[in-house]
Amino acid sequence: MLPLCLSGIQSQFFISSIQVEARTVGWVALALSHSKSIQDADIVIGWVSEGGQAELKDFHSRDGRTVEEDHSQDYELVVGYEDEGVTVLRFRRKIETCDRDFDLPVTNDTFRVIWAYSESDPRAGALPVWSDLERAGGRHI
């Protein structure tokens, strides 16, 4: 049984952690979806800036092509770094975030994990663009 979202009280149960590694010095993204598209998916995007500062943000997509930053940032960066052209990000999220608008609840149901990456970090003040399908893929889990 999963924890409930009651009157704004959030679960204290976390997905232990997820680590992604990609041969890039740009941004890396994972999306949780019920379809093959990122439309209505729960998306996390991270990168390591030129100064070595790791960034991680919670996003969603209404149209399946562009991303919008969530009003509620529910992913927590554990560690992030670049090493010899590889970006490594480890993060976690509560199983139930109570963000019914944009976060996909983690349940026993099958969902699709969609990944993507870019060769460069997002420009300051700009959102990452999810359009390079040569650097994307997915799998049901």
Feature names for model-found ranges:
Residues 1-141:
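Extracellular-facing/secreted segment signature in eukaryotic proteins
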